[in-house]
């Protein structure tokens, strides 16, 4: 990931209290970054404060995903403890989840208007303490912001939702009964950009956008209408929106990164979701394919049971990714997501996790992030902090044990 200055420049566009926040967002010119309410209208517990130095980007990012529930609870401090004692140097924290809710109280007008910051927001003092602690221990904070899968915004602002072809005044619903936003709508991406800008203002060192795609249901193309498509291919739409969003955020000087389906490294189509490797790999500073072996069909890479061969899947998949990136000028850095959860046989443990990591190392890809939807990780798979770097995991020093607390009362986020 590209390095960024120790201090950041935050461009603020102040709008009048009487102006419509949604209308103002639509009127902003490309290149303008944040839109916030005047100070007189901001809650007293606002998190924004004078700029502080951001944690610099590690040469090799080794991270864990922290879901919203984990961030709100005791698990946040446990995961910070993991990062202090192991090779983990980064935490990807849900700033906006796939229900549309924010982690903390926001100054972004649209977020306030739709109540995106009203569902159990993190207390101001706690959010500051989390980011200050991470900064003190040089732990790299990454803000994960879900873009197109936002049922809250789709319900509150129907104009931006995907519509049914038979009833254009009604939103299209996925198999779980949830509406999605239309990727053609610029406002969808401007909203994400505003949230990203705010997150950097709080102290996050990187912006990571997820669900930068169309829904992955084939019936969508029979049941939905896209009046703004204007003949463009889905992959072209996603590319154009990523490039615009990247430009809006460029003044912040932080890495612009995107999560993509793991199968994009091998599939030469857009898979119906608008994600084609050559179309997006140069539209971000970093691309993060979700390389979960359990998500590969039997026979992929001539492997009968991909889930049982994590090294081979990652090795072959990242070889494809590197090869395809070589043909694209200014291709983004590849940072794969690896699987730290069990879906089918075998049960995933330290050996399976290290096998994935070794598959990356053998391709010269030293960065990685582990995904577990509950943010419960296999600590025994991690090297102790300060252990010698090596692609050979046989000499790995075991990490100090960290007691994990199961929290069954907290609903896990759905698998991606």
Which residue stretches match the model-derived regions?
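Active-site-adjacent "subsite" loops/lids of carbohydrate-active enzymes
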Residues: 52-67, 71, 132, 148-201
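Glycine-rich, aromatic-flanked loop segments that form ligand/cofactor-binding clefts
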Residues: 88-95, 123-173, 206-209
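Conserved, mostly hydrophobic/aromatic
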Residues: 91, 134, 192, 199, ...
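Substrate-binding cleft of secreted/luminal carbohydrate-active enzymes
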Residues: 284-297, 307-400
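Aromatic-lined carbohydrate-recognition surfaces of secreted/lumenal glycan-active proteins
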Residues: 65, 140-150, 208-209, 234-273, ...
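Active-site-proximal loop/short-helix segments
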Residues: 107, 151-159, 202-233
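Catalytic domains of carbohydrate-active enzymes, especially glycoside hydrolases
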Residues: 77-101, 201-206, 283-286, 360-367
């Amino acid at each position: 990931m590209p390095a960024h200055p120790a201090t950041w420049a935050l461009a603020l566009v102040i709008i009048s209290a009487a102006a419509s926040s949604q209308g103002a967002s639509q009127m902003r010119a490309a290149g303008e970054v944040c839109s916030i309410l005047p100070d007189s209208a901001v809650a007293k517990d606002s998190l924004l404060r004078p700029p502080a130095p951001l944690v610099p980007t590690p040469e090799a990012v080794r991270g864990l995903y922290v879901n919203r529930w984990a961030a709100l609870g005791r698990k946040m401090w446990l995961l910070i403890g993991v990062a202090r004692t192991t090779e983990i140097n980064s935490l990807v924290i849900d700033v906006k989840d796939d229900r549309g809710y924010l982690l903390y109280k926001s100054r972004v007008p649209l977020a306030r208007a739709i109540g995106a910051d009203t569902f159990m927001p993190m207390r101001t003092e706690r959010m500051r303490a989390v980011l200050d602690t991470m900064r003190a221990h040089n732990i790299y904070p990454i803000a994960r912001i879900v873009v197109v899968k936002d049922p809250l915004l789709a319900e509150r602002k129907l104009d931006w939702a995907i519509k049914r072809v038979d009833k254009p005044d009604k939103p299209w619903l996925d198999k779980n009964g949830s509406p999605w936003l239309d990727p053609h709508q610029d406002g969808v991406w401007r909203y994400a950009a505003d949230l990203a800008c705010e997150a950097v203002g709080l102290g996050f060192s990187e912006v990571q956008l997820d669900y930068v795609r169309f829904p992955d249901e084939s019936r969508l193309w029979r049941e939905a209408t896209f009046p703004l498509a204007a003949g463009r291919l889905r992959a072209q739409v996603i590319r154009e929106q990523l490039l615009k969003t990247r430009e809006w955020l460029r003044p912040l000087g932080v890495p612009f990164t995107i999560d993509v389906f793991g199968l994009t490294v091998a599939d030469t189509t857009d898979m119906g979701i608008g994600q084609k490797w050559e179309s997006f790999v140069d539209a971000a500073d970093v691309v993060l394919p979700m390389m979960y072996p359990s998500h590969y069909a039997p026979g992929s890479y001539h492997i009968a049971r991909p889930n049982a061969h994590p090294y081979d899947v990652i090795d072959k998949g990242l070889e494809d990714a590197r090869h395809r990136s070589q043909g694209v000028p200014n291709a983004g850095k590849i940072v794969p997501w690896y699987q730290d959860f069990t879906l089918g046989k075998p049960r995933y443990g330290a050996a399976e996790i290290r096998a994935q990591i070794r598959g990356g190392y053998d391709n010269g890809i030293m960065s990685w992030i582990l995904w577990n939807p509950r943010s419960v990780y296999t600590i025994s798979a991690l090297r102790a902090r300060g252990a010698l770097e090596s692609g050979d995991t046989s000499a790995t020093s075991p990490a100090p044990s960290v007691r994990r607390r199961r929290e069954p009362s907290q609903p896990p986020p759905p698998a991606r």
